[in-house]
């Protein structure tokens, strides 16, 4: 029986691990990131993959740095025939990449060579793409640059956010892996080199990308809001306080106004002027120190009115 070591960390990886187990492979170990403090109370929380592995009775390793020789040797001691990774979060050393007879493969949430890196789901929406997908490829020492083994496309609906698209891609990745692993083992898979000229990148989201720049067109800001939901969430500033924007709708500007100016306050949202004489309706927000709420509930308590401005020149 093929011995597999699985390496992954967040929710995206859980269905991928489950598929390997359900397909009858001998998953001899799971490698994931260490437990991390989470939430306001900083409670030490295990990664979702660790919880799933323990539930399934599979041994778990949690190296701080997998590239340290002692940690690498622990994984090699499991004698894997194949290593499968999905959103693991660390680069593997050559010693590990070279060991398994069937190689090391990665389940990546984009149509490579587009959107290499740690945040491909975010960038697919931020860039306004209408489709993305999952690629399974051999791992090499360069980030997401190995030969491709299989791909599947996934449509991006206009109402998708990172959360909904994440779930679609996770399921698609698990199904694609189920089809691909047998072909790797029997040698029928045909690797395809990536075109480096077409490579684009999706590095981890930075704090400055979360800030809404109201001078940009409404379409761009709509993609920003859904491309940062449920994490890390786009924000603006109102009266010197952070206001997170969880959800919005595209809408027409009823009159010309300065970008960031509240044009109208309606029952179902706050219409804000954006660049190029466009507008965005904020439908779900979160004031500093409070829970997220429907815009109509926020409006009731905040005394918002047309003509007020969101955002300041000094917001950084």
From Swiss-Prot:
Any GO MF annotation of the entry: methionyl-tRNA formyltransferase activity
Provide this UniProt record's keywords sorted from A to Z: Protein biosynthesis, Transferase
Q: Which domain of life is it from?
A: Bacteria
Q: CDD domains from the entry?
A: FMT_core_Met-tRNA-FMT_N, Met_tRNA_FMT_C
Q: Give binding positions for (6S)-5,6,7,8-tetrahydrofolate.
A: 110-113
User: Could you say which protein family the record assigns here?
Assistant: Belongs to the Fmt family.
UniProt xrefs under PANTHER family: METHIONYL-TRNA FORMYLTRANSFERASE (PTHR11138), METHIONYL-TRNA FORMYLTRANSFERASE, MITOCHONDRIAL (PTHR11138:SF5)
Q: What is this protein called?
A: Methionyl-tRNA formyltransferase
- Source taxonomy lineage? Bacteria, Bacillati, Bacillota, Bacilli, Bacillales
């Amino acid at each position: 029986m093929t011995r597999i070591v699985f390496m992954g960390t967040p929710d995206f990886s859980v269905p991928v691990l489950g598929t390997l187990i359900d397909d009858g492979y001998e998953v001899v170990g799971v490698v994931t990131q260490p437990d991390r403090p989470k939430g306001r109370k900083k409670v030490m929380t295990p990664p979702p993959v660790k919880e799933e592995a323990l539930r399934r009775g599979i041994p778990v390793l949690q190296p701080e740095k997998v590239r340290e020789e002692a940690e690498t040797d622990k994984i090699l001691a499991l004698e894997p025939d194949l290593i499968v990774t999905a959103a693991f979060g660390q680069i593997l050393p050559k010693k590990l990449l070279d060991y398994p007879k069937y190689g090391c493969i990665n389940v990546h949430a984009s149509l490579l060579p587009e959107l290499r890196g740690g945040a491909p789901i975010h960038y697919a929406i931020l860039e306004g793409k209408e489709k993305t997908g999952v690629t399974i490829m051999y791992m090499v020492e360069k980030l997401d640059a190995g030969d491709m083994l299989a791909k599947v496309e996934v449509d991006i609906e206009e109402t998708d956010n990172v959360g909904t698209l994440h779930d679609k891609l996770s399921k698609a990745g698990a199904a694609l892996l189920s089809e691909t692993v047998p072909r790797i083992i029997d040698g029928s898979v045909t690797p395809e080199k990536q075109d480096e000229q077409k490579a684009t990148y999706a590095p981890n989201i930075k704090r400055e990308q979360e800030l809404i720049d109201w001078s940009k067109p409404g379409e761009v800001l709509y993609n920003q809001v859904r491309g940062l939901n449920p994490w890390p969430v786009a924000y603006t500033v109102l009266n010197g306080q952070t206001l997170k924007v969880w959800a919005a709708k595209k809408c027409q500007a009823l009159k010309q106004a300065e970008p960031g100016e509240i044009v109208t306050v309606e029952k179902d949202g706050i219409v804000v002027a954006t660049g190029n004489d466009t507008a965005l309706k904020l439908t779900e927000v979160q004031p500093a120190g409070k829970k997220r709420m429907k815009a109509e509930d926020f409006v009731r308590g905040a005394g918002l009115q047309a003509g007020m401005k969101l955002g300041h020149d000094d917001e950084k």
